[in-house]
Structure formats: C-alpha cells, structure tokens
C-alpha cells in the first residue's frame, strides 16, 4: 500500500511526504498511527487517550487529578496502579512538552470520547503564552464512507484525503470554547455543561451533540440509570429469555441502539 500510494501521489504531482518530519500528530488512541505511516506521513505521533467519558474528572491540581484518573483506570481496566500512572504521566508529559515552534495537528472525530479529550487539549493550549502552531482535523462524517464511526476505520488514502481537504488552523474561538467546556466538565454540577449544550457550540459544531450524549450517562431522575445501562437492560429484556453474551449485547448496543457510539469493547465491560 505504501508504494502504491506513493506512486499515485507522484503521478498526481503531489508531494510524497504530506507533512514534515518536525510535525506532531496528536490522537486519542493508536488507531491511525500505522495508517499515517503507510500514507507517507513523516511526523511524530503522540497518543493522548485518558478516557474522560468515564470515571471522575475532578477539578484538582495535576498530581491529584492523575491520582484520581489512575485509580479509576485500575478499577475499570486490567492494569496495575504503577502502569496506569506511568502511562498517564507519559501522555500528559508529551502534550506538556509541546510549545512555541512546534507544529501540531489534532486528529479527532465526533463522539464524546474524542470531543472531551479535544476540549481538554484545547483548554491546555489556550493557557500557554508560547503556543505551538495548531491545526486540526475534526470530522463527523466522511464522503463515501457509510456508517462512519471513527478515523481508525479509514484506509490510509482516506486519511490523506482528510489531510488535503479537512485540515484547518485552530482558531482563538475554538481554544476559548475548549477551555469553557473543560471548565464545565470538571464542575461537579452539570448545569453549566447543560447550558453549553443548549446554547450550541458553533466554533466546534460536533462538541454540543457529544456533550449532550455525555450528559445522558448521568443517572436518570426516574430510573437511576445512565443511558448505556438503560439501553443494555432494554436489549436483555427483548431477548425473550435467550442468553446473551456481553459481546452480543455490546454489538447490538453499538449497531442498533446507540445513536452516537463512543465506547470501545473494553470500556463497555
């Protein structure tokens, strides 16, 4: 694929290397790391994947915040406390190291997992006096891709298409909105987050729908259940006594019931 894509770019008169070696690609997971290499990208790759859509996101100083996040990750995933903390320290440290003179591209999609991480990154960069050159690809759909869920499902050639057609500079308005959203996310009272959703987020159009879905994970006043819990129980109730594995419940949830999928299988378990 790498040679074929390179040949096609040569024939089209496009540069073989879309970016440059001094560029840094930031993504909330590793799902496009290999595809970027196949597509010919030469820049460094930074993963920043603390899943804010789950667990406590308290308004604390960095050390205490990472303590809380590490404890949650250990409770929900098969990791030791040291491994969880070391990984978070490495990811946060890699982002903190980006500053003036760096060229950074943020790769994100439309679900609450991505958008909450995007908000945190924008909030972080908004506070810097010496800020890197920031660009972003943030999409909720891709022409010709039916059932688009995320960037990780895309062929390297489609990532190149996004690079050439969807790459845009990050604006001051987007940085300010990211800071506003992150401040609301870390507030134990969801009132401000709900206001942001109701007012809309024109600077980041995909943010408001993702935040709306995130708020629906809060316990319902009527049932005490978050939406994922309620949908999962609904799937079981419709099984007519048939035994369903967690895998089948997750598949049904993601393909037939969840309007804005954001959970991976490990996150669901």
Identify the role of each PLM range.
Residues 260-269:
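Short amphipathic alpha-helical interaction segments
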Residues 4-81:
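A structured, charge-rich N-terminal accessory region that forms the first stable segment of a protein
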Residues 27-33, 110-118, 142:
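Gly/Ser/Thr-rich loops at beta-strand to alpha-helix junctions
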Residues 241-255, 264:
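Short acidic, hydrophobic short linear motifs in intrinsically disordered regions
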Residues 76-127:
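Long, hydrophobic/aromatic-enriched structural stretches that serve as scaffold segments
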Residues 156-238:
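A conserved mid-domain beta-alpha-beta active-site/ligand-binding segment of alpha/beta enzyme cores
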